[in-house]
Each structure stands twice: as structure tokens, then as C-alpha cells.
Amino acid sequence: MIIFVMKKIFFITPVQIILLSFLLFNCQAQQTTNASLEEAKKAIAASNEIYFQAFAKGDSSIFIDRYAKDCWIMPPNAPTLCGVDAPHEFFKTAYNKFGLRNGKFITVDVFGDGVEFVTEEGFWQSFDADNKLFDNGKFLVLWKKTPDGWKMFRDSFSSDRNK
């Protein structure tokens, strides 16, 4: 292929054409991935904003709706809870046994391709009925894009306090 630019002749080989098209395609794919990741970040922030309302209102359905049907919840010093009943079991324990009534997530980062899965890392705080901090720690959550939106697929967290 011959290209004329300002009275100069440039020859472009098939290899150069392939490399140029790959470069352009890669830039477009990167923009799509960035848009998907931003969409995931917004959905996660919205989910996190209402997560602890479940405990403040005593409404497990708000909590359960944050999780994928095939989720795993991996709390500290306890067995892993798996499947559709895992969120309800965790809610009952946190609400009744530990007196969780409110909390806060502090997201440090969300990373991944934003297409099927993303990972969120951060810190959490748990408060009792008197709004007293009784536990805090860190978390890693693998989020999964489902037909119902972004849901927690693997939720692993640990406490910064002694048992």
C-alpha cells in the first residue's frame, strides 16, 4: 500500500497494517474495559451504601440481595458458608449472636476487567445498637456480574482484634 503525505511517499507493509489495526483495536478494548470497570465500581459503591441498612432495620432481605446465589462467605474463625442460604445464615449470626446493627466499608481499590468479575479490597467496621465500634478488619470481595447485577461471589474478611 502506498500513502502520499505532503508530497512524500510512504510504503506500508502488510505487517505494519496488522500492527496498526491491533493497536487501534487494543485501545478500543481498553476503553470498553475501563467503562465496564467504572460501571462495576458504581454498582459496588451503591451496594455497599445499603449493605449495613439490613442490620439497622433488622431486614435480612436487604443483606441477602447483596450476594450471588452461589456465594461463599468466609468469616474469621468460622466455617465457610456456601450457597443460596449462606447470606441468611450469616445475617442471623451477626445480628443475633454479635449484635451487629450498623457498619462501614472503606473501599481501597476495585480492580479487574469489569466484564465478569472484579475484586474489591478494603477495611470494615462493625457497630452495636449503641453505635459503639466492637470490631474492625479488612476484606477481599470477588464480585460477579449476574443477570441481577453485580453481586458478592466470594466474601472473605478478617478481624484486626483478638478473638
Region roles according to the model:
Residues 66, 71-82, 93-98:
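A short gly/proline-enriched turn/hairpin at secondary-structure junctions
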Residues 51, 59, 63-64, 71, ...:
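Hydrophobic pocket/interface hotspot
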Residues 1-35:
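Bacterial Sec-dependent N-terminal signal peptides
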Residues 136-161:
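Short beta-strand edge/turn micro-motifs at domain boundaries
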Residues 67, 77, 122-124, 156:
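A mature extracytoplasmic/lumenal domain signature
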Residues 13, 27-65, 69:
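Short, low-complexity N-terminal intrinsically disordered segments enriched in polar/charged residues
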Residues 89-129:
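Surface-exposed, charged secondary-structure patches
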Residues 131-133:
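Solvent-exposed, non-transmembrane alpha-helical starts
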